[in-house]
Amino acid sequence: QTGALAWRFYIVPGNPADGFEDDAMKMAADTWSGSWWEHGGGGNAWHAFTYDEELDQLYIGTGNGSPWNRKLRSPGGGDNLFLCSIVALDPDTGKYLWHYQTVPGETWDYNSNMDIVLADLELEGKSVKALMHAPKNGFFYVIDRKMGTLLSAEKFADANWATHVDL
């Protein structure tokens, strides 16, 4: 009601010399190399925000890296969390709950900023609280929205960066 900032979640970890805001940022930093913080890292969240009233979770879809070429932003490789991910947060505190990364080490602008749709589905005879997402990488994802577990990933468009997604 005051307009004061309630919380902030960083998609890309900062300079390790400055310490990390929480364990999630330490975990993310372990997936980067070089001095990524000097380049910005990217990973902006500009569209895909979905609130789950039933589970009281906020899901955000994140963007691609910057610079887009991973050899520049993270020369030693790595998954570069939380780029091209769906991240679940506690909406009251901003604390990290879980994530699923759709394009580890993303270097093709296959961001995950597309819509995130929630549904209760019947899968293999079981009721599942699902999250569905079709990012730019050509795969349609179904994820258990309680735990972030991948349930299905099927191609919906031609893609030459991957033949399939391991379950």
Task: Kindly label every feature range from the protein language model.
Residues Q1-H39, L72-S112, A119-S127, F139-L167:
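Extracytoplasmic/lumenal domain signature
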Residues G41-K71, S85, Y110-P135:
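Repeat-blade elements of multi-bladed beta-propeller folds
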